[in-house]
Amino acid sequence: MDFDVKQIKRDMDRLYEFLEKGNNSLMYPTDVNTLENMSANILGGVKSSIESKYKYSKVKDINKKNEDKLLRALEDNQVYLNTMASSITDIYDSCDYIYMPMDDALECKSKSDIICTLLEFMKSVSDRDYEITKSMFRNGLVSDEFYNPMYGGVCNWSYYLQKCYVLLFTGLSHYGNGCILSHEIGHAIDFYKYALPYGQIKPYYKCFFDEVPSTFYERIFLDYIKDKKIDEKAIDVYFNRRSFPFICYADDVIDFYDYMSEGYDNGNIKSEELYNYNDSFNYFIGYYVSLHLAVLYRKDKKKALEILDEICSNRLYFDYDIGQIIDYFKIDIDSFIDGDYVEPYIRKRVLDFNKRFNISSTL
């Protein structure tokens, strides 16, 4: 599983030439970021100066408009998001969750077996998802040959090239890594099925729901491996590990609203601070909504996929509207924002891990 490096170099040359002509006003930031990231990780930093050339001339205009929009959205959705975040931290606290990385206890699996399982899983979701995933591997657009300690993986996409590139930085030695890969492949599926054909050119600040499809595929792949007893231990360990950032993102959401309640002034927050909070909000919402989708998927696959399709198709029209998402689920609002719908699932997964590793509730 490795990139066709020669083809990628040709792709990056084409992208660089396109951006050099100043044609990136609509493409920023995804194409510039793709060139930057692929150059840094794959081509040793070649052409990396393109970022500095456009960073300030293009981003400033984009940022101000989207900053104002994001700030209004955070204020408008405060009741929803603050309650959702508090509910998640309360649920994990009440079911004796303890962050305990146990990757060293996992049995190594062959890369080919993990990829085969991933393809079988995608086939079980839909033929289209399977074809996209298979094409990514066949065309040398997925690699686990590069290491970056800051990230588990990344999916870079280019509207100009109409391609995605997935890098898995953890290697592919067990099914926990496979879940990270399914997350990044989920971004690629999102790109090919929605972002590209619908012309969803993304602003510098993501909308609230950009991490929903990727985290959804990650969660249902996790359940697929667990339910089929392919490697239950790896999934128990992975759920424990991935729950930790979910809780951290929830804490960030709570912290932000505490800040707002202490006399927050729109003019006082710096762009880089808002960008960092935006990341936390996106991932928290992605995890939260996809968790509800994954629980629904176990009960009604068709309905869950229909809701995912609605979210991905229409997100630029309601990019910051949590209420619209709740309407799609057609469940009680309180049940959604209080976490009642997903609490049994979380408790079961935490209990499975604690039982497996003999973790006492008194710890």
PLM feature spans:
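C-terminal, non-catalytic "cap/extension" segments appended to globular domains
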Residues: 52-69, 87-90, 94, 264-363
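Post-HEXXH active-site segment of zinc metalloproteases
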Residues: 179-180, 191-216
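Short pre-active-site segment immediately N-terminal to the catalytic Zn-binding motif
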Residues: 163-182
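Contiguous, non-catalytic segments that form substrate-binding/exosite surfaces or channel walls
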Residues: 34, 38-167, 350, 354-358
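Short beta-alpha connecting loops at secondary-structure transitions
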Residues: 167-168, 198-205, 270-275
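Inter-helical turn/loop segments and adjacent helix faces that build the functional surface
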Residues: 57-60, 125-128, 192-201, 221-235, ...
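Long, amphipathic alpha-helical stalk/connector segments used for oligomerization, subunit docking
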Residues: 219-293
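An active-site-proximal "capping" alpha-helix that borders the catalytic cofactor pocket
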Residues: 185, 208-223, 286
